[in-house]
Amino acid sequence: MKIEAVIFDWAGTTVDYGCFAPLEVFMEIFYKRGVGITAEEARKPMGLLKIDHVRALTEMPRIANEWNRIFGQLPTETDIQEMYEEFEEILFAILPRYASPIHGVKEVIASLRERGIKIGSTTGYTREMMDIVAKEAALQGYKPDFLVTPDDVPAGRPYPWMCYKNAMELGVYPMNHMIKIGDTVSDMKEGRNAGMWTVGVILGSSELGLSEEEVENMDSAELREKIEVVRNRFVENGAHFTIETMQELESVMERIEKQELIIS
C-alpha cells in the first residue's frame, strides 16, 4: 500500500490556528437578534458549508427555543438567508487576517512533496471565501496542488464529493491510497465516506478551540484532558488515526504503508 495523495482541510488544519475566523461572526449574527449563543454551540457544526452551519445552529433545541421566545416563532428560511448574508459580509472583511499557515505545515508539505505525494484540499468555505484565503496563504508559502469548495460539487461535507473531485484532478485511485486530514467531526465523516484513511489533528483544531497562547499557558494536566476528549470524539466519528500536530503525519503514513493496514 502506497499513499499517493493527502487531502487537507483549511481553517483549523493548515491555516487559522484554532479556527477563529468564523467563530466570532457566527456569534455576532445571532447576538444582533437578541439570541446569545456560546462559543461551544457556534463551533459544533464547524466544517459544514457555512449556510448549512447557520441552519444547523438554528436547529439546536436551546437556540430554537430562545428564538421562539423572542420572536414567537422558529427561525424561517428567510431568517437563515439574512443571517448568512450578514455572515458573509463580515467574514470577507476579516478573512485575510486568518490565512497564515499553522506552524510546521509548510515544512510537512515540502517533505511530502519530496516523497512524490500530491497535495489536495477541501473546505467548508465557499469559492469566493477561498479566493481570499488561498491567495493570502500562497503569499505566505502555502499552496496545495488542488482546492475543492462545496460550490464545485453537488454538496459539501459530510458527503465525499469534494474528496472524489480531488482524486480525479490529482489522478489518484483507489481512494485508500489517499489520506484525508482535518480538525472537525465533519472532516472525519467526509474522509470515511470517501473510503480514505482519515486523520484528525488536535492542536489548532476547531474541536479543541484553543489559541496558541491558551495552549502554551494552560496547565499540562488540563490540556491533556482536553486533548483526549477531542481524540475520542474524532475516533467515535470515524478517524483511523489522531495526531496532536502536523509533524506526526508522516509517521502515520509510514504505519499505513508498512503494516498493510486495512480500512474498516
Swiss-Prot record:
The active site is at D9, K50. Mg(2+) binds at D9, A11, D183. The keyword Metal-binding applies. The keyword Metal-binding applies. Disulfide bonds: none annotated. CDD domains: HAD_PHN (cd02586). Coiled coil: none annotated. Keywords: Hydrolase, Magnesium, Metal-binding, Schiff base. Its EC number is 3.11.1.1. Binds 1 Mg(2+) ion per subunit. Its cofactor is Mg(2+). GO terms for biological process: DNA repair; organic phosphonate catabolic process. It catalyses: phosphonoacetaldehyde + H2O = acetaldehyde + phosphate + H(+). InterPro entries: HAD-like_hydrolase_sf, HAD-like_sf, HAD-SF_hydro_IA, HAD_sf, PGP-like_dom2, Phosphonoacetald_hydro. GO terms for molecular function: magnesium ion binding; phosphoglycolate phosphatase activity; phosphonoacetaldehyde hydrolase activity. It comes from the Bacteria. One of its GO terms (cellular component) is cytosol. Belongs to the HAD-like hydrolase superfamily. PhnX family. Homodimer. Involved in phosphonate degradation. This is Phosphonoacetaldehyde hydrolase.
